[in-house]
Structures are given as structure tokens and as C-alpha cells.
């Protein structure tokens, strides 16, 4: 089978010539026409008979595939192109967009479901300062800070979280992004100017993000973090609970540091609500601000569970809130 990439329809005579010189049947020359969206490619290949040829060559019975659901998705994608919403993705690896591919696709999934195309503004947090903050973020309807490690660009992320909180702009913090939200809130709402994460500062008197107790003696790297799927219990009356529509969820994790329980009550007392915890209540899994349009942080990685036809509830809720800002 030859699948031929082409920007224009493959003429029949060219198809016959390729088949002749490559010693394959004519119906085994499959044009792969340039599509306006990647999600349209399965429909185009089915139209050209790829599945039928594969089934014949493998000796499998070829039924009639039901592509209606996928066709509806593609139709929805094209319909969403009429409306746009800009989300700032503030990270430290933004020069390589594929570093955040799962996050970008999750925003695309959510945007499609909400009838809008999400335009990502890639912001390198290392270059974000108090001087250029407003100019950089003023055109955005939402701000997302994704996961990451190391202290490079951390202060820029904190500035972005502060801007979102104070300006009422929807914010979604994922893993490190949730920790950034807690640090920012502790500094500027709780009044602890030196608040930080123990990962980035060994001298802060307010390590609102600290190493998890069971990670204290771990020195080996690679596969030693809190990894994989864990349950999370959502508090009633929170945006998180509303987004998911259920009390208990299971999400995928990859981290060593957590919101410190030492400062938890004090931070909650000034307005940062713990929206989700581990079943025993010890680990903070989600935080949010009740009187903000959407200021939500999660310690887990929701982008790993988003699908084209089933956008993740947190991304969907975030995009809905961003659209409401327009």
C-alpha cells in the first residue's frame, strides 16, 4: 500500500502510473490529501478506500464503518472556527510548543465543544516582568500555567497568576501551576512576602509548598515521584465539583511537592479554598477562589485524560469562563 501525501487531488492517470512503476494495484495507491484539520484525515482516508484495502490484504471481513460520530466532530471543529478566544500559556519551555502538546490539544478539545477556536499566546515566563506584564497579557481572556520543574521563570509565572487573580481573568494552574497559584496568593493575599516553595528556596519562613512526607528520604531520580492515577474527593459547592458533576474523581499525577498543611488553614482563612483532597484529607489536590470567575489549580494533570470528543471538565470549564470574558 502506498499512501501519497498531496496538496491537490491525485489525477487518475498519475495514480495508474504510480501503481505501474511501484508494482501495486491501483486501489493500493491511496491519496492523503491535505486537510484543514488533522481530525479530518481519517474521513479522507476512508473515502479513498484505505480500510477496505487493508482488510482485503489481511484477509479480514470488511464491514461498513460507522463514521457518523467522527463526522459530527469534524463538523463541530469547522463550526468553531467562526469564534476565537485567546488563552495565554505561560511556561518555561514555550520555544518548543510540543513540550505542551497535551495541554494545547486539551484546549483545542474544550474550545471545539464550546463552539470556539482557542488561539494560544505562548508566553515565556522567564521574560515576563512587572514592566511588560500588562502589555503581554492584556489581550488574553484566560491564563494557563502548566507543569514544570526548576526555578527558572518561576517569578514570571507568579506575576501571571497575580495578574489573573487581581484582574478577574480565568486562570488554570496545572501541577506546578497550582503551586504557583498558592505561592502568589500567600504572598499578596496572606501578606507573606517571602512565601515560596521549598523546591526553590531553602531560606523562606513560609514554605507554602513543601516536599511530601514520603519523599523526604528519596534521593534516587526517575520513577520515584508520586506517579499515576489517584483518587480525589471534591468539596461540595466548588467550581471543581460543578465542572466534574461528581464527588470522587481519579486523575493522573507526577510530583514530589504538595501544598503544605502547616499553612493550609491560614491561607484558607483569607480566601483560597481547598476544593479537592485525597480521600484521607491530607493531600491538597485542588484549590480555587470562590469569588473569582475561574481561578482553579489542580495538582494532577487533566490534559492526559482529555479526548477530542470528550474534553476534560476542567479545560471545558476554563474555556467557558474565558469566553464569558469577551
Model-derived features: positions:
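N-terminal beta1-alpha1 cap of cysteine-dependent amidohydrolase-like domains
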Residues: 1-291, 299-326
